[in-house]
Amino acid sequence: MTQSYVNKEEIISLAKNAALELEEAHVEEFVTSMNNVIALMQEVVAIDISDIILEATVHHFVGPEDLREDMVTSDFTREEFLANVPVSLGGLVKVPTVIK
């Protein structure tokens, strides 16, 4: 049997905290699935990677040498820009309210 990392009560609490509706019939499925995922992650963490050269795996990140210098240009006037927005107010772009 797989080691138990989480139990039924923890799954119910997790679903509640995440504002998810979880039917009682599916709770045991989630307990089993979550325990399987955690067990798999335990196996991944246990893999010995000491012989891997870590420096060779970080070259895909963007560094300062990959960025262009910021240069101010005046391709558009304010009027040209505002002509393309749905709603403007006092020379500014009016956007919908996000926070109530």
From Swiss-Prot:
GO molecular function annotations of the record: asparaginyl-tRNA synthase (glutamine-hydrolyzing) activity; ATP binding; glutaminyl-tRNA synthase (glutamine-hydrolyzing) activity
Enzyme class: ligase
UniProt keyword annotations, A-Z: ATP-binding, Ligase, Nucleotide-binding, Protein biosynthesis
Catalytic activity: L-glutamyl-tRNA(Gln) + L-glutamine + ATP + H2O = L-glutaminyl-tRNA(Gln) + L-glutamate + ADP + phosphate + H(+); L-aspartyl-tRNA(Asn) + L-glutamine + ATP + H2O = L-asparaginyl-tRNA(Asn) + L-glutamate + ADP + phosphate + 2 H(+)
InterPro entries membership: Asp/Glu-ADT_sf_sub_c, GatC
EC number per UniProt: 6.3.5.-
A Pfam family hit: GatC
GO BP term, pick one: translation
NCBIfam families with a match to the protein in the record: gatC (TIGR00135)
Function according to Swiss-Prot or TrEMBL: Allows the formation of correctly charged Asn-tRNA(Asn) or Gln-tRNA(Gln) through the transamidation of misacylated Asp-tRNA(Asn) or Glu-tRNA(Gln) in organisms which lack either or both of asparaginyl-tRNA or glutaminyl-tRNA synthetases. The reaction takes place in the presence of glutamine and ATP through an activated phospho-Asp-tRNA(Asn) or phospho-Glu-tRNA(Gln).
Complex formation: Heterotrimer of A, B and C subunits.
Family assignment from sequence similarity: Belongs to the GatC family.
Identification of the protein by name: Glutamyl-tRNA(Gln) amidotransferase subunit C
Organism: Chlamydia muridarum (strain MoPn / Nigg)
